[in-house]
Amino acid sequence: MKYTIIPFLLLVALTCATARSIDGSEKEVQEIREETPSSNEDVPFSLSANEDEEARGRLQAFLAKMKEIAAQTLGREESLSANEDEEARGRMQEFIKKLKAYLRKMKEKFSQISGREESFSANEDEEERGRLQAFLAKMKAIAAQTLGREESISANEDEETRGRLQAFLAKMKEIAAQTLGREESLSAIEDEEARGRLQAFLAKMKEIAAQTLGREESLSANEDEEARGRLQAFLAKTKEIAAQTLGREESLSANEDEEARGRLQAFLAKMKEIAAQTLGR
């Protein structure tokens, strides 16, 4: 009997100790729950002064980096030093040169195609010419605004411009020879119509030459007379070639004429699209 009571007392003591331990654990859990808000409750987020200052600093650094990237993308700093300003001007002049070269290529293609058969009405032809002139005027205005100055060309630049004019006239002569270098057999009415188109073509070439140079020619009396003489000689030579060529056989089939007209319309549509994209319309 004595040995039976001892284990019983030990069991009771163990049970009491376990109960106390469980009660203590429950109290600790309750305290933790009281200190920790529920996940379903909205907890306001408030930064300390140091954390707020750190976040503000990171934001300012981010904005400064964005400003730097924007300046690099635009190709200039907001306030340029002398060297940086010169570099930006050089990049702009290079862009203008590329733009002029692109326009010259477009004009050459237009000149080559305009030498073929056309069946545009007077209104459509005038409308296309007006759009082209407006586009060229817009390009000239953009170039003038971008450079921000009137062109004052030195002797070397003037010589370079004169060389470009001579190359342009040589190219026009080559195009005229290639265009007119085919057999023609025109009636009196068709011959008059072709002569009218040729005169319009020569007038257009003269206009394009003036627009290509992008400025009024201010040559000395001798240079002006020399340039005028070369232009008159070119026109006389072109008329002579035209007269010789118009006296020969030409027989284009209806399909070839339709094909040429289709290519011309496609080219004009492409020019209209490029002009619309450039002008931002």
UniProtKB/Swiss-Prot annotation:
It comes from Lycosa coelestis. Residues 20-56, 75-89, 115-129, 148-162, 181-195, 214-228, 247-261 form a propeptide. The modification Serine amide is found at residue 114. Optimum pH is <8. It is found in: Secreted. Expressed by the venom gland. The modification Leucine amide is found at residues 74, 147, 180, 213, 246, 279. Retains its effectiveness even after exposure to 100 degrees Celsius. Residues 1-19 form the signal peptide. Its main location: secreted. This is LC-AMP precursor 3. It comes from the Eukaryota. Keywords: Amidation, Antibiotic, Antimicrobial, Repeat, Secreted, Signal.
